[in-house]
């Protein structure tokens, strides 16, 4: 296995082993040359192995000096065209059935990846990022799948810190667009599929998948992980997941697989009971986060978890549990011999981790902080860290299906200087409806509200929908870099 791993890394090969009870065939495919270098087994096994490579090959392939033609189109030239085309298709039903059938046609190649699966209401992206940074420090190549996009559509799929290549998306779309239409799979399912292919092509050591919505019916639930992780349970996406903590916990418990252990940072007993029941049915172990000790608030929060003294490069208190959950997961993987893990990698990786849009200081003068607190629990956690800020002024916007009354009331506990805005999104709430009867300012154009920052003194906190934060971040960075 170690030889295979190094071979993959150094030469960018895909090695596929046909395995029943015993290994009875192997194929080696060079993804740079598009050449099958080796194929061993009986004639029947060889045909099966070649069929797998033909299915995932993006271009004509060479085998024994002969060309095997791969059918592909020239429909797309730029990755933006791919997304525009997919968005034009009809709405898809929130179900995993079609995607399961689709992946069966691809021999369930996702099972070749060593995955970690992360669900939860808040903190998923941060937890993924903390794990990725520590694994990177340990020398591993790590693929991550997170959503929604914050900086670019490309940042959903990354290897270490590099976004997926635009041309890869174009090549995959031209190769498989007819299959997408045939199975009527959704944009999110297509993104998951592209990530699976990309991680296989690039030979990642590990892939970490963040659930998009819920758990059981989410497209990421197509993977077979080494371990499943839950950050917490909050009241969000209630139209899809139900309007109680219990119903949301049941939806998220849907990622629990047979004999795959489940680690959670959730504290509410009614949710933990649901996780425990599901784990028992799945013959999986439920693992809960240990107590966190010696917490120190400040510019860099500090704490002790088990025997590790951790310092985070953020004042955001909510990142303590996210990073501790990441650490607990990595310690589990080490204990069960999935990974090697040194203390230096843990300490350095957790400290160096940064995640855009989560208590992100984007400017020092004036002090501007971005935070994607987009639901009740998110705003509660934001309050804990933001209450120490002085002369605070808030700019806020949200989607219309969120509990915006609660969110604004909580923000008013921090300051009465709040401006509500709008942003471009089909579900964006109008500034007027956001404001209601609350003592807040209304400025529909968020750009005008941001421009006004530079005419005032104080500390500025911009918060709400992650889609809003994405737009704000782009605008502010352009403004900062133009000075």
Regions found by a protein language model. Give the residues of each.
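Acyl-donor binding region in acyl/amide transferases
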Residues: 33-72
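ATP-dependent carboxylate-amine ligase catalytic core
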Residues: 93-96, 100-111, 137-223, 239-241, ...
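Conserved beta-strand in the GNAT
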Residues: 22-31, 35-37
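Extended acidic/charged loop-beta regions that coordinate divalent cations
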Residues: 191-240, 272-309
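Short functional linear segments
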Residues: 73-120, 127-140, 145
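C-terminal helical cap/extension that packs against the catalytic core
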Residues: 268-278, 283-287, 297-300, 367-368, ...
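Nucleotide phosphate-binding/pyrophosphate-handling subdomain across enzymes
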Residues: 112, 201, 206-209, 219-229, ...
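Active-site rim helix/loop that mediates acceptor-substrate recognition in acyltransferases
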Residues: 2-14, 18-19
């Amino acid at each position: 296995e170690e030889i295979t791993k190094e071979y993959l890394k150094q030469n960018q090969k895909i090695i596929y082993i046909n395995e029943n009870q015993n290994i009875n065939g192997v194929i080696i495919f060079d993804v740079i040359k598009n050449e099958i270098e080796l194929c061993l087994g009986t004639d029947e096994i060889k045909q099966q192995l070649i069929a797998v490579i033909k299915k995932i090959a993006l271009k004509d392939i060479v085998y024994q000096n002969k060309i095997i033609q791969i059918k592909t189109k020239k429909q797309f030239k730029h990755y933006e065209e791919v997304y525009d085309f997919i968005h034009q298709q009809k709405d898809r039903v929130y179900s995993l059935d079609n995607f399961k059938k689709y992946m069966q046609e691809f021999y369930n190649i996702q099972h070749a990846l060593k995955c970690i699966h992360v669900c939860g209401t808040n903190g998923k992206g941060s937890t993924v990022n903390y794990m990725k940074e520590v694994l990177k420090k340990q020398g591993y190549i790590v693929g991550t799948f997170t959503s929604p996009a914050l900086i670019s559509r490309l940042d959903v799929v990354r290897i270490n810190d590099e976004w997926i290549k635009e041309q890869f998306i174009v090549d995959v779309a031209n190769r498989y667009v007819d299959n997408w239409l045939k199975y009527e799979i959704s944009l999110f399912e297509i993104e998951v599929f592209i990530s699976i292919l990309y991680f296989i092509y690039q030979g990642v050591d590990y892939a970490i998948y963040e659930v998009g919505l819920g758990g059981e019916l989410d497209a990421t639930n197509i993977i077979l992980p080494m371990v499943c992780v839950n950050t917490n349970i909050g009241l969000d996406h209630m139209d899809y997941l139900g309007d109680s903590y219990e119903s949301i916990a049941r939806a998220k418990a849907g990622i629990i697989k047979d004999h795959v252990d489940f680690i959670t940072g959730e504290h509410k007993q009614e949710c933990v009971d649901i996780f425990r029941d599901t784990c028992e049915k799945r013959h999986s172990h439920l693992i809960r986060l240990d107590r966190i000790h010696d917490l120190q608030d400040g510019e860099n929060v500090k704490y002790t978890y088990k025997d590790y003294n951790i310092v985070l490069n953020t004042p955001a208190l909510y990142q303590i549990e996210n990073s501790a959950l990441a650490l607990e997961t990595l310690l589990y993987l080490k204990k069960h011999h999935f990974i090697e893990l040194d203390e230096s990698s843990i300490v350095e990786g957790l400290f160096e981790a940064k995640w855009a849009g989560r208590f992100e200081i984007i400017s020092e003068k004036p002090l501007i902080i971005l935070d994607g607190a987009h639901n009740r629990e998110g705003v509660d956690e934001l309050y804990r860290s933001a209450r120490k800020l002085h002369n605070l002024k808030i700019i806020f916007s949200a989607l219309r299906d969120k509990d915006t009354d609660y969110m604004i009331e909580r923000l008013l506990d921090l300051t009465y200087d709040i401006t509500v805005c709008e942003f471009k999104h089909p579900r964006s709430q109008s500034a007027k409806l956001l404001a209601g009867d609350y003592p807040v300012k209304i400025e529909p154009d968020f750009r005008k509200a941001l421009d006004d920052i530079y005419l005032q003194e104080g500390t500025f906190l911009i918060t709400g929908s992650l889609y809003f934060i994405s737009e704000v971040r782009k605008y502010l960075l352009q403004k900062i870099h133009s000075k």
